[in-house]
């Protein structure tokens, strides 16, 4: 179990170092006010600055990058103050532009939380993309099976839930998994 509550700086540094050890170039955060994007006032997700590379443009630093993207979200500003909503936050991300897929990604995240931080598996909850019938995008059973197998290897039987909707709309990228960790209050 983790011995202390790490600071934001410690979490960011440890994540980026871990991804660098796994062959990723560490890049700085994109601008909070995106350039050349008339569709939005602020960067609201980690993937927003990555869109050109996700759509096929080569990234100057290669096929694997990691970052801590500054984000601002105002769509749920009335909810700020509960345990889930914020307006400004940093989103840690690692990106593959045609280099690796779910098998490597899920194992890396599992190892980061469990081996790097020593978090207790019994406090994890993982949700995977549940599909979108209207768009013809199927449920992501592949990711769910990968997560379940990792937990089974540690002697735990688990169920995997559906990823939550965002403002009533499910995302269409089939790799969206959410990892929740419930810590005990003392």
Locate the predicted segments by residue.
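Structured aminoacyl-transfer and RNA-binding surfaces used for tRNA recognition/handling
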Residues: 2-186
């Amino acid at each position: 179990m983790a011995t202390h509550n790490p600071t934001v700086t410690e979490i960011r540094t440890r994540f980026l170092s871990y991804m660098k050890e796994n062959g990723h170039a560490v890049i700085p955060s994109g601008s909070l006010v995106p350039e050349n994007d008339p569709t939005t006032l602020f960067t609201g997700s980690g993937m927003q600055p990555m869109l050109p590379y996700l759509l096929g443009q080569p990234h100057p630093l290669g096929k694997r990058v990691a970052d801590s993207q500054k984000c601002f979200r105002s769509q749920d500003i009335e909810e700020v103050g509960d345990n889930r909503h914020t307006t400004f936050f940093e989103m840690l991300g690692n990106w593959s532009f045609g280099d690796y897929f779910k098998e490597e990604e899920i194992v890396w995240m599992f190892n980061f939380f469990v081996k790097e931080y020593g978090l207790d598996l019994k406090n994890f909850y993982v949700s995977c993309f549940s599909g979108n019938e209207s768009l013809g995008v199927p449920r992501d059973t592949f990711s769910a099976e990968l997560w379940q197998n990792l937990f089974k290897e540690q002697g735990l039987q688990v169920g995997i839930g559906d990823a939550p909707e965002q403002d009533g709309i499910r995302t269409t990228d089939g790799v969206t998994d959410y990892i929740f960790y419930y810590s005990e209050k003392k």
